[in-house]
């Protein structure tokens, strides 16, 4: 039979563990929410004509934002977060039924593809090679590719290139956090 001191110690240990888990969860979700809010705000900027992207770099995450300045809303079409857990995509405008999420770090992601990514008139497929290469292609042929073998696209950037429907590389505006 446990003593009163042992029982009290166990209860305190469980309570401290719960409080720590809650604090860590709130910190992580708050960090993601703050980044999303900032990038959503930045996504309303007017950029040069063409389907371009913006990179936002944080201490633990990188956000890549796809734009279509010819869209009536002049807003972002889609967004991809790259962090230690992999890739997370989300439509910035709530009217877009768009989003995808890959668990596991990108270099170790299982080979294969995920279909059914849609942004109103846009739809796409995401591919993983299993060797660190991730590629997202929209229905018109445009998209992005992350490949550790690619040279850095910009100072502080990732090994990522953005391409148009004709395969040509697209410019990328860089916005540091």
Residue ranges and their predicted role:
Residues 124-132:
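Structural motif
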């Amino acid at each position: 039979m446990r003593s009163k001191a042992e029982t009290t110690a166990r209860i305190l240990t469980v309570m401290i563990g719960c409080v720590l888990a809650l604090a860590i969860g709130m910190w992580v979700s708050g960090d993601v929410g703050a980044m999303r809010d900032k990038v959503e705000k930045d996504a309303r900027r007017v950029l040069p004509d063409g389907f371009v992207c913006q990179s936002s770099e944080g201490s633990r995450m990188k956000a890549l934002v796809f734009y279509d300045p010819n869209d009536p809303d002049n807003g972002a079409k889609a967004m991809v977060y790259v962090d230690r857990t992999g890739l997370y995509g989300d439509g910035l405008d709530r009217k877009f039924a768009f989003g995808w999420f890959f668990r596991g770090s990108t270099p170790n992601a299982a080979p294969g593809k995920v279909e059914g990514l849609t942004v109103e008139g846009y739809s796409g497929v995401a591919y993983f090679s299993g060797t660190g290469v991730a590629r997202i292609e929209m229905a018109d042929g445009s998209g992005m590719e992350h490949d550790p073998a690619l040279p850095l696209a910009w100072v502080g950037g990732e090994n990522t290139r953005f391409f148009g429907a004709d395969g040509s590389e697209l410019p990328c505006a860089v916005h540091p956090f």
